[in-house]
């Protein structure tokens, strides 16, 4: 009976993973809400990780890459979102460092600035609004100032 209950939780987790990728913490939370004991959750997570169905490191790298390139988010927002998903800080930092080598963050910031300032004219108020917008998207003030400086040079 115990084995069958574990299989039930395992199959439940597999069905979740058919629809989208989850972190181990998210799966553990779903199992907890489903009534799984800590021991059963650990067993299911161990089996899923052993078969390669969940991998927080790979998930984090994909999430960071997509967040930079598709969502146009900065490091701070990405970090915050991954923490909400239960990803370990060390994995988050490694993922950000790895992806930053491949992605031109300044280019992303410049694209966002160009979308916000369409006519090319920039008052102090417009620049402040753009800075606030970019900071809300999770970009570093240093990166923002560098990108604004580059635009002014053009």
Where does each model-flagged region fall?
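An alpha-helical, amphipathic repeat domain used for nucleic-acid recognition
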Residues: 1-154
């Amino acid at each position: 009976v115990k084995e069958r209950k574990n299989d039930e939780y395992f199959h439940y987790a597999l069905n979740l993973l058919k629809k989208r990728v989850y972190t181990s913490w998210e799966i553990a939370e779903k199992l907890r809400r489903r009534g799984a004991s800590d021991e059963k959750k650990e067993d299911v997570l161990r089996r899923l990780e052993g078969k390669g169905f969940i991998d927080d490191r790979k998930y984090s790298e994909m999430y960071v890459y997509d967040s930079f390139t598709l969502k146009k988010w900065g490091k701070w927002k990405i970090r915050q979102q991954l923490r909400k998903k239960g990803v370990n800080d060390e994995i988050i930092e490694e993922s950000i460092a790895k992806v930053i080598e491949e992605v031109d963050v300044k280019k992303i910031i410049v694209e966002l600035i160009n979308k916000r300032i369409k006519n090319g004219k920039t008052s102090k108020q417009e620049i402040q609004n753009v800075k606030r917008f970019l900071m809300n998207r999770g970009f570093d003030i240093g990166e923002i100032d560098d990108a604004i400086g580059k635009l002014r040079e053009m």
